[in-house]
Amino acid sequence: MNKNFLALGLAAALLAPQVAGAEGFAINEWSAEGVAMGGARMFAEDDAANVAYNPASITKVKGEVMKSSYTYLSPHGNYKLYDYKLYDSNNDEIKGEPTHNKVHAGWAVGTYYVRQINDKEWFGIGAFPRFAMVSEFERESKASSNAFFSKLNGVSVTPTYAHKFDKKWSAAVGAEINYVGLELQKNLQMKMPVETPVETKIATIDGTTQIEGESYALGWNAAASYAFDDKNEIGVVYRSRITHSLEADFKMYPASGGKITADAYGVVTLPDSWDIGYNHKFDKKTRLELKATRTNWSTYDALNISLSNPSVPGVLPSNVDSAKNWSNGWRYAIGLEHNFSDKYAAMAGFAFDEASIPYNGGDFMVPTGLRRTYSIGARYNDKKQTVAVALGWMDVGTLDFEGHPEKGDAYS
């Protein structure tokens, strides 16, 4: 392998935290072929992206392989505010504020390298986003008091060791170095002391708040694959939960002018997950993959932020708590790959994601319900290089969630 090309790929991996991100929370778009097959790509031959989809399958790589992937994601959506206080007895006079999100596209970048050490051992490393999102709404909309800008940049670096025990069994274990960079903005009302000639009064002040910080944390993964015969194979992948202790900067900009700052701190646990996959080869040209992913989103039970060392004492609360109480969810995917020749192939896929966000735990940070993803792709390869392209369309279902309980409103 060209050492300069490898150095370029590792540099791209280090830059990934700055560019990875898409609306949503979990990212599955780790390669063009993976996108084309709906994420059901756990048993690909000679594919360095197996580091991400199924580390045990890096034993299918012959020699030394490197791969880079760039997926462009462009989310579009709309919402409506419902005021329950305006319902009549027939429930047919709902007053709503229809509007939409600001399109905030992002890139999911992946870089992978796999090397066969000998007939039994392989080493691989990948840098790709497992969790990321960007959502933005108009600053003057009614959504802005919930969140008008939310961004989670994320990347995982996963050094992996794999061993092939025999013709049937392969297994892998790896570490995960996970980075997250978080930024949240919303409009908020705060209680502030105001001096008058007679006394000091507490006034309600409108302002914009911003929380920005980053964190690194460690996790691990393990995988195993078993081939029944030349045509049928199963695999399982486990990825551990990762706990981030996030130190951040808090800023508030009152409408009247000025700035209030404070130190912010929060703990967030990213969920662990299980992938179960099945691969069937109809013949030497066509194969089908099935995949089910269980993500334990119940670890995201709250987003609680503590504030300390404010620049203006007595204004900010010591804690800003937000219950989430997400439920565990499943993602199901099916992918088909057909090789027309030794050089050309086509792929198609479908995936269904369950909704995990409850009515009283939704927000405009991740305003998405169940998802259906339809995708197609094509690939060209020769003995030294592979080029693939894919196109996916995600149909995101409606998510209804609570607005401000004291006002009795809600969003959809």
Model-assigned labels for residue ranges:
Residues 1-22:
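Gram-negative bacterial Sec-dependent N-terminal signal peptides
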Residues 23-34, 42, 86-88, 92-93, ...:
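Outer-membrane beta-barrel porins/channels
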Residues 26-41, 59-78:
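Transmembrane beta-strand segments of Gram-negative outer membrane beta-barrel proteins
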Residues 39-46, 75-104:
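Surface-exposed strand-loop-strand hairpins of Gram-negative outer-membrane beta-barrel proteins
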Residues 42-44, 51-64, 113-119:
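Outer-membrane beta-barrel pore proteins
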Residues 59-60, 74-80, 115, 131-136:
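Short active-site-adjacent helix-start/loop capping segments
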